[in-house]
């Protein structure tokens, strides 16, 4: 059965008085087999029937008989004195925070399934946005988008997507002029809570290594991902029917703990069949989140992590996971991650904990003085969209001072401590491979990204009943049932922004993100 046909049949057979219709199928098998030019002798199509995308819907032709438009392209020039425009806002799965850098587009055919994990297409942004987009837009720091030259008519599909996060909706009617989806639709446009929320929805395959000192695994629950997506079962490549897209691994000391961190308990992060022990294991995942373990990560495999990022993987590492990037035993950078920061570690004397909470300044320019559009977007988002700043600064509940990033390093600082002694960089990132080839515009064609955070993101949330020092109880928790659900703490707001930015196509530092190009008639 054509997926789009089953969806459109669902529109016909359901009593859809609502202005937003999620992708689902209903109705009889007889009607689902009907289509333009089917020759089944069934007579006229039922009222409201719309041919599935790509079936019997090619339209105008040029004078020489060649095709001038296909499917919804034929409905893009139906307005006199101007076309149709779509506007609206896009939110996280919880529907709480508007999101930056999310692409919105009208597809001209069914979007293709998104494969899990790292493969030959992982470095290609163009491979993500399938369905032949014919009208596109992208959200700004306020989560707002504008799509111009949209097709007019009934049952117009819209895809919202950032990286491998994707959701799919249908607008029952688009008219000439401006169509404000915030008022026309009864529900918000959100990224999906589950893998199968709509017909073409998708959640990245995410691996999380838990830790003794933080609860990074709970962030995804707070931004709206369903508990049903959490599993202690490693993902397959491709997915192969494994349940859930949030895969929990036991970091130190859960590896030796009798208390499971998931039900069923997840495997060890570093042991055989774990998360980073081999390339084939880690390559199953689109994104890897490493939650602080309370001590230096045991048995890190920097070469495997570097291979993963070079091929398009995305990594968020916090605090003691610096062991992947710096060899504390020799006081030298790991050779796979040279000069990403100047490290000054707790083990080198004096400890690394600030006595109290600190403030951080969001970096809106690069160390060179050049523009940093994504840093400016982060500042604007924290300041006016989610109101997370105190004055102009971001409050950090539990910060550490293990690293400083300056213009002499290959990384980009996103948040620097302000007024704290010693100084530190709280968030920074770098793109890989370090020796990336140049693209046609002369810019490095980076593939993957690492974000390092020198703080505990769950410190203000009281996950697993922790009321003070997370070190005292995080390891006793069960994920995701022990996670606190509620409004994000300000420093966790910043992590949400960075997490979804990490999911997206790698935008070269210093440039502004752009929507994908529109498709031309075939």
Over which residues does each language-model region extend?
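A short, solvent-exposed beta-strand micro-motif common in secreted/extracellular proteins
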Residues: 104-106, 133-134, 143, 153-172
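A glycine-centered loop/beta-turn motif at secondary-structure junctions
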Residues: 310-318, 400-508
């Amino acid at each position: 059965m054509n997926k789009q046909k089953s969806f459109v049949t669902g529109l016909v057979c359901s009593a859809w008085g609502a202005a937003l219709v999620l992708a689902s199928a209903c109705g009889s098998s007889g009607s689902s087999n009907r289509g333009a030019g089917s020759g089944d002798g069934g007579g006229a199509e039922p009222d409201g029937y719309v041919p599935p995308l790509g079936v019997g819907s090619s339209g105008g032709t040029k004078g020489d008989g060649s095709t001038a438009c296909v499917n919804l392209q034929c409905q893009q020039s139906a307005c006199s004195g101007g076309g149709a425009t779509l506007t609206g806002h896009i939110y996280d799965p919880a529907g709480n925070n508007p999101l930056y850098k999310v692409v919105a587009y009208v597809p001209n055919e069914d979007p293709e399934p998104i494969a899990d994990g790292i493969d030959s297409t992982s470095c290609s942004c163009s491979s993500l946005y399938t369905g032949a987009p014919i009208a596109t837009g992208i959200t700004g720091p306020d989560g707002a988008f504008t799509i111009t030259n949209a097709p007019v008519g009934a049952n117009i599909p819209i895809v919202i997507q950032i990286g491998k996060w994707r959701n799919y909706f249908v607008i029952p009617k688009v008219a000439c002029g401006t169509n404000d989806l915030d008022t026309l639709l009864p529900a918000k446009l959100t990224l999906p809570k589950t893998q199968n929320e709509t017909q073409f929805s998708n959640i990245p395959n995410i691996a999380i290594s838990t830790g003794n000192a933080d609860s990074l695994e709970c962030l995804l629950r707070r931004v709206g991902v369903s508990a049903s997506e959490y599993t202690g079962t490693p993902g397959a490549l491709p997915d192969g029917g494994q349940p859930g897209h949030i895969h929990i691994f036991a970091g130190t000391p859960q590896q030796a703990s009798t208390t499971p961190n998931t039900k069923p308990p997840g495997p060890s992060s570093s042991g055989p069949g774990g998360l980073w022990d081999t390339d084939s294991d880690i390559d199953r995942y689109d994104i890897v989140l490493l939650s602080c373990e309370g001590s230096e990560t045991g048995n890190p495999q920097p070469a495997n992590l570097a291979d993963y990022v070079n091929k398009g993987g995305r990594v968020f590492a916090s605090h003691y996971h610096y062991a992947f990037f710096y060899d504390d035993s020799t006081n030298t950078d790991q050779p796979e991650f040279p000069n990403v920061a100047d490290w000054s570690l707790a083990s080198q004397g004096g400890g690394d904990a600030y006595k109290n909470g600190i403030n951080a300044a969001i970096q809106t320019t690069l160390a060179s003085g050049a523009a940093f559009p994504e840093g400016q977007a982060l500042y604007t988002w924290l300041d006016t969209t989610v109101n997370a700043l105190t004055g102009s600064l971001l409050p950090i509940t539990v910060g550490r001072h293990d690293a400083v990033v300056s213009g002499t390093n290959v990384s980009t600082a996103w948040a620097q401590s302000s007024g704290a002694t010693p100084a530190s960089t709280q968030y920074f990132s770098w793109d890989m491979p370090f020796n990336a080839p140049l693209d046609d515009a002369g810019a490095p064609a980076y593939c993957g990204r690492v974000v390092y955070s020198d703080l505990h993101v769950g410190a203000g949330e009281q996950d697993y009943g922790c009321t003070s020092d997370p070190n005292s109880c995080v390891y006793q928790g069960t994920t995701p049932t022990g996670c606190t659900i509620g409004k994000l703490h300000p420093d966790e707001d910043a992590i949400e922004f960075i997490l979804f930015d990490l999911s997206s196509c790698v935008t070269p530092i210093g440039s502004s993100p752009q929507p994908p190009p529109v498709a031309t008639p075939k």
